[in-house]
């Protein structure tokens, strides 16, 4: 459990960075699809 507590912030930071990067790249290539109404 102690190893999980030390690894959790690192995994969360990498996950949020990857998600933000994917959203930025998607918005750069497809700017109209991100804000298109469903």
Curated annotation (Swiss-Prot):
Keywords on record: Membrane, Photosynthesis, Photosystem I, Thylakoid, Transmembrane, Transmembrane helix
Give the record's GO CC terms. Answer: photosystem I; plasma membrane-derived thylakoid membrane
User: Which domain of life does this protein belong to?
Assistant: Bacteria
A GO biological process held by the record = photosynthesis
For whether the record's keyword set contains Calcium, the answer is no
Q: Which Gene3D superfamilies match?
A: Single helix bin
Q: Where in the cell is it found?
A: Cellular thylakoid membrane
Provide the topology term for how it sits in the membrane: Single-pass membrane protein
Keyword Transcription listed? The answer is: no
The record's Pfam families line, in alphabetical order, gives: PSI_PsaJ
Q: Which family does it belong to?
A: Belongs to the PsaJ family.
Name of the protein this chain belongs to: Photosystem I reaction center subunit IX
Species in which this protein is naturally found: Synechococcus sp. (strain CC9605)
Query: What gene, per UniProt, encodes this protein?
Result: psaJ
């Amino acid at each position: 459990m102690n190893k999980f507590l030390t690894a959790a912030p690192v995994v969360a930071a990498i996950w949020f960075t990857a998600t933000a990067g994917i959203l930025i790249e998607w918005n750069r290539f497809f700017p109209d699809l991100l804000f298109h109404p469903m």
